[in-house]
């Protein structure tokens, strides 16, 4: 059976260049690699992690010359792999190098261990990701306030910060002709982070228009712009890069213009192990961090105002647990004395990815597009089955998830599930993304955007420098997640040779002969379980929501029950989003930086 869609058919842009050797040396000369240079010192703010959010917030705080900021980053600045980092067309070549942390999961479904790709170095995952630049659905961000009680976290507010972060570059006439549409009202033009069309100078592939014409013939909208609050349909997308096609990573955008500030120091090659606290009448107050490379070689540095955790969704919860903040049973097992009970490390929401690839005839040239497909487009003939699951299984799923250790409160988790049900059935929110790439092939990378599975990440020992933890996304422990991934992958195969695409289709290579052309969705489920990979978009391990619903941080990113401690990275969004996540994280970082500065002004 075929899917319904088939059967119903602060540098100016001109001057930005690749890093020069002289520039490399100058930046390196301003960075610190000797931990004794900061040992025992006091800064206003100590930031654990020099990735997207860490460097963004550090840049904003240090605009005030009176504020002293220290960033501690486990990795380094650039590397021997620098040219690969700078070229967004070399995506994937950087994996396995010195800037890829490559966390491993516990054994997953079918006893497969997953690799979690994550950037290591100043810039974090912006050094290695696909630099795709899209925004989520309005109702998703609105739910952060409406459902989870986070005042001020609504689309209209967050959209302003996403625009403030952006320095957008409109497409040229040739790019528009190829299918690169643009709505200037949905973009910022005066921000720090450069974004615009990816263009390697080759002709544009006719496959872009062929895909648009194929899906639009069956009622799928061709989107003018995926940044306006309802990314459903198909369009080409901008990327996080400069006009000369150099990657606009967070180090280039936020560090390079500011590394010479006297009040901003960056320490590399050191890992933050835990937060230091003083006990007060109002509860534990963060006063610094312990950092280093191993149990015998570590140091303390102090924060007069706040400690800000920006180590990412896999690591920030571990730092909290090593510091004594978390679930008592987890901390007891690891040998850590509990300081505060919070559901740290739970509610992990990552996505899964599969690929469909075919050869292409007479379709040379470049181009990337995305098809954000809604629930019925993805499930097709199985839509009624999916609706029935959402109407009858939420209670059961919540109970099973809590029993497996993905969350701690059945009632609160059901509220999350009801929110997702509303998105999918009532709000036309995209359920899956089919990311389309050409260059002599028809290639879809496909992921279910809205997972109901909840995983976890927890420490396994009391030594933060041993790197012992359990990263357990629990992929496909929910039947709708598996059905959705299978149906979306099946849809990718069908689209590859449907409509106008058919004249360019020259035979499938993935899955190819590994799966019959008339495979059922059940056969696709078996295939998916053996051939998926993590999508590396995990969020919510330190969820920003009301404490009653299972939150770890409040609407200002402050850790509940503490003073002087915030989590400011991708571990705090309470939901997944139907987009690539950089735009959300940048907007989030700017909003949090503003909140930190407001508190600083009050204290001063």
From Swiss-Prot:
Task: Identify the stretch annotated as signal peptide in this record.
Answer: 1-18
pH-activity note: Optimum pH is 6.2.
Q: Which InterPro entries match?
A: FAD/NAD-bd_sf, Glucose_Oxidase_domain_2, GMC_OxRdtase, GMC_OxRdtase_N, GMC_OxRtase_C
UniProt keyword list: Cell wall, Cytoplasm, Disulfide bond, Extracellular matrix, FAD, Flavoprotein, Glycoprotein, Oxidoreductase, Secreted, Signal
Taken from the UniProt record, the cysteine pairs bridged by disulfide bonds within this chain are: 186-228
Q: What does this protein need as cofactor?
A: FAD
Temperature dependence as stated in the record: Optimum temperature is 35 to 40 degrees Celsius.
Used how in biotechnology?
Glucose oxidase is interetsing for applications in glucose biosensor production, the disinfection of medical implants or in the food industry as an antimicrobial and/or preservative agent. Glucose oxidase is used in the food and beverage industry as a preservative and stabilizer as it is safe for human consumption. In bread industry, the addition of glucose oxidase induces positive effects with regard to loaf volume, bread shape, and texture, but had no effect on bread color, smoothness, elasticity, or mouth feel.
Q: What class of enzyme is it?
A: oxidoreductase
Q: What is the effect of changing residue 426 to W?
A: Significantly improves thermostability
* Classification via Gene3D superfamilies: FAD/NAD(P)-binding domain, Glucose Oxidase, domain 2, Glucose Oxidase, domain 3
Positions glycosylated per UniProt: 111, 213, 278, 409, 531
- Any single GO BP term: secondary metabolite biosynthetic process
Query: Which family does the record assign?
Result: Belongs to the GMC oxidoreductase family.
Its recorded name reads Glucose oxidase
Q: What is the lineage of its organism?
A: Eukaryota, Fungi, Dikarya, Ascomycota, Pezizomycotina
Gene this protein is translated from: GOD
């Amino acid at each position: 059976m075929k899917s319904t869609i088939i059967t119903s058919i602060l540098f100016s842009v001109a001057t930005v260049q690749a890093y020069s050797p002289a520039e490399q040396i100058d930046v390196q000369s301003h960075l610190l690699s000797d931990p004794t240079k900061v040992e025992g010192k006091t800064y206003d703010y100590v930031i654990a992690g020099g990735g997207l959010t860490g460097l963004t917030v550090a840049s904003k705080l240090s605009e005030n010359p009176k504020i002293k900021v220290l960033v501690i980053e486990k990795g380094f600045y650039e590397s021997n792999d620098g040219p690969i980092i700078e070229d967004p067309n070399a995506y994937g070549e950087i994996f396995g190098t010195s800037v890829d942390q490559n966390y491993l999961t516990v054994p997953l479904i079918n006893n497969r261990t997953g690799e979690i790709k994550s950037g290591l170095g100043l810039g974090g995952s912006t050094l290695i990701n696909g630099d795709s630049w899209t925004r989520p659905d309005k109702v998703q961000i609105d739910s952060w306030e409406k459902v989870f009680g986070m005042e001020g976290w609504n689309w209209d507010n967050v959209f302003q910060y996403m625009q403030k972060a952006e320095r957008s570059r409109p497409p040229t006439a040739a790019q528009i002709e190829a299918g690169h549409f643009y709505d200037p009202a949905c973009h910022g033009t005066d921000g720090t982070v450069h974004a615009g069309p990816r263009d390697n100078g080759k002709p544009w592939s006719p496959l872009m228009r062929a895909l648009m014409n194929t899906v639009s013939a069956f009622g799928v909208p061709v989107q003018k712009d995926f940044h306006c609050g309802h990314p459903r349909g198909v369009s080409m997308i901008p990327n996080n890069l400069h006009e000369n096609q150099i990657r606009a990573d967070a180090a280039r955008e936020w560090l390079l213009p500011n590394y010479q500030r006297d009040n901003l120091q960056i320490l590399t090659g050191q890992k933050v192990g835990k937060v230091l606290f003083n006990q007060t009448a109002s509860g534990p107050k963060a006063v610094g961090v312990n950092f280093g490379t191993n149990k015998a070689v570590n140091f303390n540095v102090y924060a007069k105002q706040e400690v800000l955790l920006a180590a990412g969704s896999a690591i920030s919860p571990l730092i909290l647990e090593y510091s004594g903040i978390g679930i008592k049973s987890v901390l007891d097992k690891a040998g850590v004395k509990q300081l505060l009970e919070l559901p740290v490390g739970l509610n992990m929401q990552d996505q899964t990815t599969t690929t469909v690839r075919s050869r292409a005839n007479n379709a040379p040239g470049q181009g990337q597009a995305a098809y954000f497909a809604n629930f019925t487009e993805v499930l097709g003939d199985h839509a009624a089955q999916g609706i029935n699951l959402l109407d009858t299984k939420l209670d059961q799923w919540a109970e099973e998830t809590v029993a497996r250790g993905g969350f701690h409160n059945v009632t609160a988790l059901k509220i999350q599930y009801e929110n997702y049900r509303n998105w999918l059935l009532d709000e036309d929110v995209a359920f899956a993304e089919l990311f389309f790439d050409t260059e002599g092939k028809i290639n879809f990378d496909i992921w279910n955007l809205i997972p109901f599975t909840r995983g976890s990440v927890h420490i396994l020992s009391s030594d933060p420098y041993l790197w012992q933890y359990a990263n357990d996304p629990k992929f496909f422990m929910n039947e709708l997640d598996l059905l959705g991934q299978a149906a979306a992958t099946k849809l990718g195969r069908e689209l590859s040779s449907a409509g106008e695409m058919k004249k360019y289709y020259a035979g499938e290579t993935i899955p190819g002969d590994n799966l019959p052309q008339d495979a059922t969705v059940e056969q696709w489920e078996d295939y998916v379980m053996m051939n998926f990979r993590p999508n590396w978009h995990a969020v919510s391990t330190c969820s920003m929501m009301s404490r009653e619903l299972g939150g770890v941080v409040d609407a200002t990113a402050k850790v509940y029950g503490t003073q002087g401690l915030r989590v400011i990275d991708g571990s705090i969004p309470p939901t997944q989003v139907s987009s690539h996540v950089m735009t959300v994280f940048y907007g989030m970082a700017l909003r949090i930086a503003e909140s930190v500065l407001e508190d600083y002004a009050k204290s001063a």
